[in-house]
Amino acid sequence: KRYCIYANIVNILVETMYHFNGINLYEGAKNLILANGLHCFAILHSNKDLVAEFENNFVGMVRKPSIESVANFYRTTDKLRYDVDTREGFFDMLSEIPPTIQYIKEALTHKKFYIDLTIPLFSVSIQEWYNKTKVKENVLFDSSEPFFANIEFMESLRDMEVPETVVGYGKGKHVYPLPVGNMEIAKSHEEFGIQLADVFASALCFALTPRNDKFVKYQDKIKSLPIFQNIKLNIAPSTNDFIEARMKETAEIDPLDFLCEHSDRININKKSNI
């Protein structure tokens, strides 16, 4: 989740600025280079308290946009840029952020759950299952606030009045309309599938949480289970090889361009955002 803060700084703030200046940040993996660079420099920075303040102020600004929260974030950005322990490379990457303030109204039009991982992981999972089975599965959610807040948007992507179209870059190619059947909220205690998913999620969280106590041996046992040997759908820092490969990939159809081009065919409340 900490990496995702930096990915969202790039996606929400920097990408918006570049978009208004006619530059596609996703071409050539420029977004990944910046997000991974910011994250790497941040975890190596010696002033942990200042870095934590920077991260927390960004999350606070996105969750509850206000004059005060915006000022706090950009003020902390400058504090971190000019901190005595900030390396030159980190300074240069952080310097992409201050100019974004002139586009802040456009950047912060998202719902408060925008930076939550539930929806992007769900979307990628749906695409992966459809790629394997060619079946548009019905999905049940428990009482998930991010899902409840975004169900209208996801249904609108599912019901797009366009032919099935492949968009995206390299291994990240996916299709629209969103290949999913019915999506409903259910009570977890009444659905065995949801209970089973919770067990797997808890086990995976336990296995991946760093620790050095007596429970490490149980982590190793859980990690060795066959079901956890093929986890492809994660949001995490990229390897150098992945970024280098991604830099060479091109998209015949850019996902955002496609959605914007067909926005009139997405039946969604005008107050919602693509």
Predicted regions: what is each one?
Residues K1-I274:
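Phosphate-ester processing/binding pockets and catalytic centers
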